[in-house]
Amino acid sequence: MACNLSPVNEMADSITSSTPSEIVYGGPGSPDEHRTMSDKVQTMASAIYRELETMIKVHGEDGVKTLMPLVVNVLEALDLAYLERDEQTAELEMLKEDNEQLQTQYEREKALRKQTEQKYIEIEDTLIGQNKELDKKIESLESIMRMLELKAKNATDHASRLEEREVEQKLEFDRLHERYNTLLRTHVDHMERTKYLMGSEKFELMQNMPLPNMQLRNKMGMAASVDASSIRGVSDLISAHMTQSTTMDVNLANHITNEDWQDEFSSDIEPSPRDIPQSSADALTSPITTKEPTPKREAASPKQSEEEEADETTSVDPKENNDLLGADLTDDESDWNGLGLIPRRHRPNEMLDDDDTSDDGSLGMGREVENLIKENSELLDMKNALNIVKNDLINQVDELNSENMILRDENLSRQMVSEKMQEQITKHEEEIKTLKQKLMEKENEQEEDDVPMAMRKRFTRSEMQRVLMDRNAYKEKLMELEESIKWTEMQRAKKMQQQQQNVNQKKSGGIWEFFSSLLGDSVTPPASSRGNRASSSRGKMTRSVEYIDPDMISERRAAERREQYKLVREHVKKEDGRIEAYGWSLPNVEAEVSSVPIPVCCRPLLDNEPSLKIWCATGVVLRGGRDERGQWIVGDPIYFAPASMKKTKTSNHRPELEDEIKRARNLDARESELDEWQSSSLVWVVSSNQGKSLIAVLDANNPNNIIETFPACDSHLLCIQAVSGVMEGEPEMNEEQSKKYLSGGGKIKDLPEGLDGTDLGACEWVELRKMEDSEDGVPTYCSNDMKPSPKRTRDFSISEVAPVDSSAPVKEDPLPPPANRPGGRAALPPHIRDAMSKYDGVSGQMSGALPTVWMGGQNQYIYIHSAVTAWKQCLRRIKMPDAVLSIVHYKSRIFAALANGTIAIFHRNKHGEWSDEGYHSLRVGSATSSVRSLCLVSTNIWATYKNCVVVLDAESLQIVKVFAAHPRKDSQVRNMQWVGAGVWLSIRLDSTLRLYHAHTYEHLQDVDIEPYVTKMLGTSKLDFSYMRTTALLVSNRRLWIGTGTGVIISVPFSGQLEKKIETKDSKRPAGPGGLVRVYGATSENATNDEKTNDDFIPYCNLAHAQLSFHGHKDSVKFFLGVPGASKNGEDESAEVTLRRMLIMSGGDGYIDFRIGEENEPELTGQSIRPRDMSHLIIWEVDAELPILSK
């Protein structure tokens, strides 16, 4: 029967302690209160005892009756003084050691800072040199570009000058052409008049006369060809004479224009064949032929062409010039002869007389023409000479301009270089000044070191940056230290209060008992004075002035806490659009009420042990095992259908191998969701007090009935894990097989910053040897080279009862009959009794192959207990190199995380029992940091080391991946939970949860719960604003989150990430939410039901989060999910798919945030109120049962 949660109406003021979320190893332990007296005090007491005995014999008891209490008080004060001195000496040694460590760390940080600054200076110098080189290159490129621009400008100017010269030459050519045409017309008119005067006969006779030479005859071909029949008018004659004159006067054309204009002019005035006879054309073109320019000459530059023209003009010798001039004159004479006007020196004597009258007129015109031709030749020669001189002057001007521009650019470049050099000189002078200033500062450094930082005049930016970084680091450390100090000082106050009460209540002490034999029972010790002295001495030893009066401090804190809970209660009552149901604050969304967890029980762990502090728990797995005959004991989990298990075999059934394959595939498909259904409702809860651990066994279906309690060890247990019995087909390990897993480290290359990969992944075999039998008879094993580790103690007690000596035997309280006895098993549910009955006939020798429970302790031991037989009897005890922090079971292997940075892997032998030959040790990191937690993810083991997650292959024992889950190195990964294809992580002292992909290790989502809790519970002084996650659980596709302030949150998973994370509907108030950062996306088409386990990514949306009003006063220690029994009226033989899942949370104290602690009456005579004790809260959730057919 489940226990219903009844509201508690009576409240009382209580002192709540803030338990630190992280175990600090190596802390100081509590002093032993029941120690023996010091030797000196004992010697003095013996001497005084003898003296008092002598006085009693002489004077009787009345003589020493008043003296003896004074003597006893003096001796007690002396003993306390010795005790105080010893404690102060020990404390002084610890402070010295801490001081040395801090000094060493400071020196190391100082050296690292100097190295960093030196590297920074070197890098800065390198960059400055590179910048200077680049500046030089840029300057050279700029100078080259300026020279090229100058050359382009000069070429443009030269082209423009050539164009202007070309225009001038064209104008000159037009003027000369016009003048030549005028002369030609005058000459033609003269020829016509001469022919008219002479007559045709004389003209023909003159044509037939022989010429003096052939050259003159050829040159006169034009005049001879022009007869009356061929010349049809003045225009034809003008055209013929223009062609002759143009052809004969080639030298004149060369002086006037360049080659291009010569070609153009020749083509424009060339006569057609019909106008000139063939013989005349040949005569005109044969003596003087213009040479066509070659392509090479055409491609030459204008300047080169001008030089060639000048050379051609100047290279003509005087003989050629005379020939040309003679040709002109001869041509004129031939023209006269062709018209019948022969000069006088060439005429015969008989013709002289006849022509005297006509010679006078013609000779006058000829002389005028000859004078004009000579004048024209002289002018052309002078023009050519002037052109040559002009071209030379232009070339000289161009050269001088170019030289001037080049010199100007060089001057500019030198000026720029001078400016650069001046700047460098200025920089060097500034550097020299800076160096001088630094030198002066170095000389005065000794004096400035004595001056505080705030009093110094100079405060540079680097110093400010360093101070800010140091301040932030110190602030983070201060927050952690304040939390630890709060816990430590609270326990000190409670211890002092209890010591004072114990001293006041005691009737006899150690020294008083020593002297009690001298007097009768009527004499009582002065307890009040002794207690006052003890209290005062303890008060002086306490550093904090706040805890000198613990009663006053307790009352003040209780009053503050009541006021704070009152504020929380008022904030919770506000209407914010949310729904309250079953003690939960639900979002106003369309959700089924059946999905809300229903609280069914809330109770202290043990009523008769109010000082116990709950720590961890596990659900016992009643499956697997092997008996003495080698037969397998198979216990089917609850997720197999009972109806399918009762089916009889038929001839048509499939082969057993196919059924087994299908069963394995179905199990692998939803492995993470089926793990929570493998255990039973039998729960082992670990609690501790005064450094001793106690195990409480209960059934989650009926938690009010504690089945059995027994002490586990004299140390604090840090973890517990239920392990199933050996299963058929699980691998075994022998000495030969163990060697194949041995390997060295350094194989993983891509490592996060700050993680040393030298020994990462190194696996070695550690042999075990059996130690000498202990007093309790438990077989104890340790490694061959085991060395005694440094003593690590921590006081986990807040008990007001005086601590018991650890060497004294533990007195067990009367307990109910154990479950393994016939009387105790009747209290168990029927399904647990049936499961345990299968192991009744197995002897104790085979208990290692049966279901067991493994526990890891702070005292570096692993304890193995049987889960089905004698629970309190420890089967084996293994000494480890360091404290055991986490234990995970995978098939036939146990993975244990140790505080020295290693993982121990235990195996089964061929008999199915856990091997005592040895175990594998896998190195994860340095021994200064611990492997905090382990989590089974498919076939891998995820281990947390500092801020990193190390993924280990559970079968090959090889590290496959290492990634950083948090950027800060000092932020340790605390909890991990796997479901589907995602793993949720929580970070120590951080309110943000992180989701990673289980196979690709991709960061998928961040969820910050701090804004959500602040919105729900307000910003009071209960540290709700500084939220940290202390417990995580994934059950039935729901994430349970426990915080350091006792707040419990449950968030249903969604198979796909919703696009709209925050509700922004204006018609209704927005639901509470927090920071939700998404790094991945899933398909929107697939639904949750269609997804397989490997495809299901457990995204969270705080808009659907549910907050429980039932919580703990301190941090939530653990969550545990176990299957519940069938509901009343259900037929267990029927195949059902809806079963109960019980979610259990454990923590210090209980609080209902809707009520708080107001108006609770004080409980006099009790040191701990009921609501301050460790509590268990159990919820019931209707879960869909993943039934698989066998």
From Swiss-Prot:
One family name in Pfam for this protein: RH1
InterPro entries cross-referenced by the UniProt entry: JIP3/JIP4, JIP_LZII, Quinoprotein_ADH-like_sf, RH1, RH2, WD40/YVTN_repeat-like_dom_sf
Every RH2 domain range: 456-542
Keywords: Coiled coil, Cytoplasm
Primary localization: cytoplasm
Ranges annotated as biased composition (Polar residues): 277-292
SUPFAM superfamilies referenced in this protein's UniProt entry, alphabetically: Quinoprotein alcohol dehydrogenase-like
Classification via Gene3D superfamilies: 1.20.58.1770, arf6 gtpase in complex with a specific effector, jip4, YVTN repeat-like/Quinoprotein amine dehydrogenase
GO cellular component: axon; axon initial segment; axon terminus; cell body; cytoplasm; perinuclear region of cytoplasm
Residues in RH1 domain copies: 24-112
Subcellular localization, as worded in the UniProt entry: Cytoplasm, Perinuclear region
Record region (Disordered): 1-35, 263-364, 775-829
Molecular-function GO terms, alphabetical: JUN kinase binding; kinase binding; kinesin binding; MAP-kinase scaffold activity; signaling receptor complex adaptor activity
Coiled coil region boundaries: 78-165, 383-491
Tissue: Expressed in neurons of the ventral cord, retrovesicular and preanal ganglia and nerve ring, intestinal cells, seam and hypodermal cells, body wall, head muscle and pharynx.
UniProt entry tagged with the keyword Cell membrane: no
Single biological process term from Gene Ontology: regulation of JNK cascade
The protein's role, per its UniProt record: The JNK-interacting protein (JIP) group of scaffold proteins selectively mediates JNK signaling by aggregating specific components of the MAPK cascade to form a functional JNK signaling module. May function as a regulator of synaptic vesicle transport, through interactions with the JNK-signaling components and motor proteins. Binds specific components of the JNK signaling pathway namely jnk-1, jkk-1 and sek-1. Associates with components of the motor protein, kinesin-1. Pre-assembled unc-16 scaffolding complexes are then transported as a cargo of kinesin, to the required subcellular location.
Protein family according to the UniProt entry: Belongs to the JIP scaffold family.
Name of protein: JNK-interacting protein
Source species: Caenorhabditis elegans
Encoding gene (name): unc-16
